[in-house]
Amino acid sequence: GLDYPKTYIFSKGDKTTDFKFDYPVIIKPSDSVLYWQFPFEGMNKAYVAKDKDEFIEITNKIYSGKYNKSLIIQDFIPGDDSYMRVLTCYSDRNAKVKMMCLGHVLLEEHTPTAIGNHAAIITEFNEELMNKIKTFLEDINYVGFSNFDIKYDSRDNKYKLFEINLRQGRSNYYVTSSGNNIAKYVVKDRILEKNLDLKVQKEPFYWHVVPNAVVFKYVKDKELVNKVKKLISQGKEATSFGYNRDLEGNFK
C-alpha cells in the first residue's frame, strides 16, 4: 500500500482538538476551488498549528467566512523543503502508466497564498517508490495526468503521500524540460491513438523559477547545491522564465 501522514477530516462545528497524532499539525481546505472564492484577511494556502489554541484560532478564522466544507488535518512531517518530492505521471486510455517523472524539491515558495509551490527541482529516480505508485494507478484504472505531493519522513524512513492532484502540477515544466513533453503524450494517446512505451525519467535535470543565487543561498544541503552547480555546468538546466524565442525580432 501507499504510506501517508496520519489524517483527520474536520468539519465546521467540530469541537475536536485532540487527534491520534501530536501537534504541530497541518491544516488545509478539502475544497480549494471553493476556498479561494472567498478571500479573507490572513488567508493562507495551508497552515501549521503549533498547539490547540492556535488550531482553534486558525479554524475559527477559516469558518468565519463563507467557506463551509471540511478541512484536512494532518500530522506535520519534520524537514525543510528538500524533504519534499513531486511525481508526475501520465496514464493512457487503457489505464496503463506511460510516463513517470519524479522530482526532488530543493526550494518551495513561502508567500502565504503560494506556500508549497515548487520553486526548484532536480529530477531523480526511485524505483521502489515509483513502482508502488504505478501499481496503485493501474489497480484503480486511472486515466490521464496525476501529480503526487510526497514528503520523506525521517522518523520512519518512509515517503508519505499528501495527495494526488488529478492534473499536471504548477511546476510541470520540470517534466517537459527534462525530456518528457506532456503535450505530446496527450496528442499521441488521445488524438493519434498510438500505443506508447513506458518512459521513466532516470537522468537528473535541474529546473527552477527562482534565480540560481537564491537556490545556492537557501538550500541547506550543500551536496544538493553542488549537484545543481554540476548540472548547470553540463547544460542540464531550464527555467520557466527563460525562453529565448520570446524576444526574437524585438531587438535590432
Q: Could you describe each region identified by the protein language model?
A:
Residues 74-75, 143-155:
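A short glycine-rich, hydrophobically flanked beta-strand micro-motif that places a catalytic Asp/Glu
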Residues 157-167:
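A short beta-strand motif that forms the metal-chelation/ATP-contact edge
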